[in-house]
């Protein structure tokens, strides 16, 4: 274990917390030592406190960890803490941890809108972590203690949406109009109450509370440039990009599918083949940094007319890769395509772990 960074997980008994634990088990750079949950779980061995619902077995390395309350005093030894807390509780707890000088990577929505809190999809906008670097450098220059910080993981469906947009914008310039219709897996709703089986079997639910709004504004923050002083990010304006989302829950276990149409600002627009080549050639910065979990192929361009499909394609690059298919011209905008991403890996806990790997590679933890 020598040389590993000490990690903790908040909300360890929940759906996202369990996924964090799976991804951190036997990780080459992080040692999971502290687990936080509610007061009714505190004091118990993790194996006795959790109702384990992952398809993979509970890692032995986590079974005997004694669960702590979600208070910073129990996490002082941690170099990084991953938060899988529900938004109802995350705000106050994560703020207390940050004020105690602890680094937090959060899956909750509470601080995503804050201009000085990076909202990160690690295969898309790791440069926004310069906000953290600037904060640490400023404190050091002023002779102050090392500050804590919060980094937010994006909404699960936003992660899949922005992944192909980043290389296209870098290559062909701004996208000024974008529509997406999602087909989202039931795992995105978490455990009980989640989505009742009687509601989703033989059915599609054309509503996910708050999801469409999150996709529309998060896209405008993730794709926005850093401020010149690297202290914050402002959302792109409606004049710069218009985003419209419609979100549906479908009877799929894992993997969010999105039907996207987009328009480039610059004329003439690229060709279909140029778009495909751009996506195939994209290499994310996390891979260039040598991060353990980074996908070797960030975007998999599929030529089969009936792909991507969740069951067949969600686990590409261990769930960190994004699959894109059916790329073709759109008679209303410029192009349309189908995008698939693993909602609990690159769309949630896996994104958090890859963010931490980038922080480590940049000596920010």
Swiss-Prot record:
Its EC number is 1.2.1.11. NADP(+) binds at residues 13-16, 38, 41, 85-86, 188, 343. One of its GO terms (molecular function) is NAD binding. Pfam families: Semialdhyde_dh (PF01118), Semialdhyde_dhC (PF02774). It catalyses: L-aspartate 4-semialdehyde + phosphate + NADP(+) = 4-phospho-L-aspartate + NADPH + H(+). Homotetramer. Belongs to the aspartate-semialdehyde dehydrogenase family. This is Aspartate-semialdehyde dehydrogenase. It comes from Saccharomyces cerevisiae (strain ATCC 204508 / S288c). The gene is HOM2.
């Amino acid at each position: 274990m020598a040389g590993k960074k000490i990690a903790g997980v908040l909300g360890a008994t929940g759906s996202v917390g369990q996924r964090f634990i799976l991804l951190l088990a036997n990780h080459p750079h992080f040692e999971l030592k502290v687990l936080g949950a509610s007061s009714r779980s505190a004091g118990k061995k993790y194996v006795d406190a959790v109702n384990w619902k992952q398809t993979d077995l509970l890692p032995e390395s986590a079974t005997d960890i004694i669960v702590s309350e979600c208070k910073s005093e129990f996490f002082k030894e941690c170099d990084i803490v991953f938060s899988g807390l529900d938004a109802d509780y995350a705000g106050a707890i994560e703020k207390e941890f940050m004020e105690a000088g602890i680094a937090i990577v959060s899956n909750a929505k509470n601080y995503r809108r804050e201009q000085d809190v990076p909202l990160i999809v690690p295969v898309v906008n790791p440069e926004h972590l310069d906000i953290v670097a600037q904060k640490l450098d400023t404190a050091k220059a002023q002779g102050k203690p090392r500050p804590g910080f919060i980094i937010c993981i994006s909404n699960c469906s936003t992660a899949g949406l922005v992944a192909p947009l980043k290389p296209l914008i870098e290559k062909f310039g701004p996208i000024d109009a974008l529509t997406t219709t999602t087909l989202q897996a039931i795992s995105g709703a978490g455990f009980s109450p989640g989505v009742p089986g009687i509601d989703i079997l033989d059915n599609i639910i054309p509503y996910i509370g708050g999801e469409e709004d999150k996709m529309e504004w998060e896209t405008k923050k993730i794709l926005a440039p850093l401020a010149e002083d690297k202290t914050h990010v402002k959302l792109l304006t409606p004049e710069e990009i218009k985003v419209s989302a419609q979100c549906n829950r479908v009877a799929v276990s894992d993997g969010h599918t999105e039907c996207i149409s987009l328009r480039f600002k610059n004329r003439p627009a690229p060709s279909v083949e140029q778009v495909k080549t751009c996506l195939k050639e994209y290499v994310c910065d996390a891979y260039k940094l040598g991060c353990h979990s980074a996908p070797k192929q960030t975007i998999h361009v599929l030529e089969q007319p009936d792909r991507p499909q969740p069951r067949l394609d969600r686990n590409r690059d261990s769930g960190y890769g994004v699959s894109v298919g059916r790329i073709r011209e759109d008679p209303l905008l410029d192009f349309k395509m189908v995008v698939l991403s693993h909602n609990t890996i690159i769309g949630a806990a896996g994104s958090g772990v890859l963010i931490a790997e980038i922080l480590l590679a940049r000596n920010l933890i």
